Amino acid sequence: KRDYAILVLTIHTGLRSCDVRCLRHKDIDWGKKTMHIIQGKTGEPVDLPLSDTAGWAIIDYLKNGRPKTSSDRIFVRHSSPHGPLGSTATMDTVLTKYILKAGIIVKSGEHYGMHSLRKTLATNMLVSGTALPVITQTLGHQDPKSTELYLSTDIQGLKQCALDPDEEYGEASV
């Protein structure tokens, strides 16, 4: 339940691993369905919507999966002592576990850590027509140029979408 909540929250919000690990109960306004966090990387505050899917995943974890602990962090270790999660590597291990379970083959040199979920969110937002300033704000970037790095074009994906003009329109007569 914890891993599911972590992955869903990351996919829906684009939070950095450090911000997911440090998320506290007081950071979530359940009535407004929002989160207010101070970003670990930049120290800047960011307000984000909390989707129903992510919210229910967190609630399910809190009610049915989280060990009893005095920690104010949402996500805690499940082995004793039940304190805050460790490093970003711990978060990457969560994702890696499910990549392997799903039988997904990651090519040598490909990056697939938790940070890749931020890029996926940014790309999906762009594809759905979300404006760059909104994507920038969602990712907690100060400079839109930082966001643009997340939106690099996937040449292989474009090649798969390309049409063969000869196939579509017949041989061109010159």
Where does each model-flagged region fall?
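Conserved catalytic core of the tyrosine transesterase superfamily
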Residues: 1-174
